[in-house]
Amino acid sequence: MSLVCSVIFIHHAFNANILDKDYAFSDGEILMVDNAVRTHFEPYERHFKEIGFTENTIKKYLQCTNIQTVTVPVPAKFLRASNVPTGLLNEMIAYLNSEERNHHNFSELLLFSCLSIFAACKGFITLLTNGVLSVSGKVRNIVNMKPAHPWKLKDICDCLYISESLLKKKLKQEQTTFSQILLDARMQHAKNLIRVEGSVNKIAEQCGYASTSYFIYAFRKHFGNSPKRVSKEYRCQSHTGMNTGNTMNALAI
């Protein structure tokens, strides 16, 4: 799968010309680099260690976090951070690049931690979403960051630095619309919440619906069943799974 960006840990200071501009990079500095400009750093590879991030990892990170979207005048091609625990970060990158990386969930948490170093930087979300290959994927990732937000087409355009007419055109080419993406994202979020949240009112609110009755209507239309019905099915599945587990334990004894 294509890489979206890399996190670079500099262990020897160096000067470089990146995109026709001179930079001085310090020992211990951390960079997040858009894959589109990664080649500009290749001549200096002996000065740093790095870990690459795939589109799938970025999508999961955006879905699991709740970072406020902050627009910047010009999309950044790389971000800089300092004052991080360099010893720990060095060990993390070494592990993530090693053959010992056989614990998927643990590795994923380490990858998310590396990304989170830059969460407060302006342009962070823009750099990540610009690396997602499809336009509809970029829109979906933005919505997934905060499903309860009253998203408008203009908000998405501001995040992606694109006009409303062009965004509509690109989404049409991918056979979808902003409204459809917003609905799908909220409905999937609702379905996930139903597994752990008993209150339909709270679920509706967390999915951006001011009216619980309209949320129930939209949910039923989308999935063919009401939220309560789906919740009941999940509970039955969970109960059946527990009984099966108890039966297997009894047989083992």
UniProtKB/Swiss-Prot annotation:
Provide the protein name. Answer: HTH-type transcriptional regulator YdeO
Q: Does the keyword Transmembrane apply?
A: no
- From which domain of life does this come? Bacteria
Q: Does the keyword Glycosyltransferase apply?
A: no
Question: Gene of origin?
Answer: ydeO
Any idea which residues the entry calls the DNA-binding region? 154-175, 200-223
Q: Which PROSITE patterns match?
A: HTH_ARAC_FAMILY_1 (PS00041), HTH_ARAC_FAMILY_2 (PS01124)
InterPro entries for the chain: Homeodomain-like_sf, HTH_AraC, HTH_AraC-typ_CS, Tscrpt_reg_AraC-type_HTH
Expression induction or repression: Induced by EvgA.
Query: Biological process GO annotation list?
Result: DNA-templated transcription; positive regulation of DNA-templated transcription
Q: Can you name one GO molecular function term for this protein? A: sequence-specific DNA binding
The family database entries (SMART domains) matched by this protein are listed as:
HTH_ARAC
**What are the HTH araC/xylS-type domain coordinates in residue numbering?**
137-233
> What is the native source organism of this protein?
Escherichia coli (strain K12)
Function text: Induces the expression of gadE and mdtEF. Could also regulate the expression of other genes involved in acid resistance.
Query: Which Gene3D superfamilies does the protein's record reference?
Result: Homeodomain-like
For this UniProt record, the keywords arranged alphabetically read as follows: Activator, DNA-binding, Transcription, Transcription regulation
